[in-house]
Amino acid sequence: AFTTYGTQLFLPFSNYRVSFDTINVVDPFYTVPLLIGLITSLSINRFKRSRTKPVLIGLALSTIYLIVTIGVKQKIENVFDANLAKQGVIYDDLLTVPVSVGSINWYGVGKTDESLFIGKFNVMHGNEIEFMEFPINDSLLSTIDHKLASTLKWFSKGYYAVAKRGDKIRLYNMQCDMQGVRTYGNYRVPTAFYFEVIPLDDG
């Protein structure tokens, strides 16, 4: 639940994904202590009482790391909020997600009714954030299957941008795939990964 993908904790009563967005999906600062603790424990005679100690130490270190990332995220949100306000952006919702190990690099997405404002911040450098604006283009989803559109919105938790390329509709998901703004010639997109759908002739 601490990653951007989240966990559906309330199934089968609700398909809501709980996600605290404090660590990357692959973060060795969390997994390595657990693995070292487990491997060390397996190397100890199973009849010794001390066998569980390495596992508990690894679990404690990983848990402490998770708690620290919660505090880091709160500070990061304050930084993005201040930078958005400084640049005159009045947003409705704010998403902040780590994009590297150790929760060092973060992307922030300020969402308005019509646009997403995306910026990057490095904890070590403390840089001023430059935001890029992308229109949401929600109306383009009306050209594809309603159920599919609803599923795509659910998966992105509302943080998406839609674009039309030729006869295809692309949905860029900022919640689960924030890799940063990409530029291809004169074409700029909010992140590298996207879902691509070909609308039916009847819409």
PLM segments and residue spans:
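Alpha-helical transmembrane signal-anchor/signal-peptide segments
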Residues: V72-D92
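Flexible, glycine/proline-enriched loop segments at strand-loop-helix junctions
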Residues: S19-V26, S41, L66-I70
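Conserved catalytic scaffold of divalent metal-dependent phosphoesterases
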Residues: F13-S14, D21-T31, T63
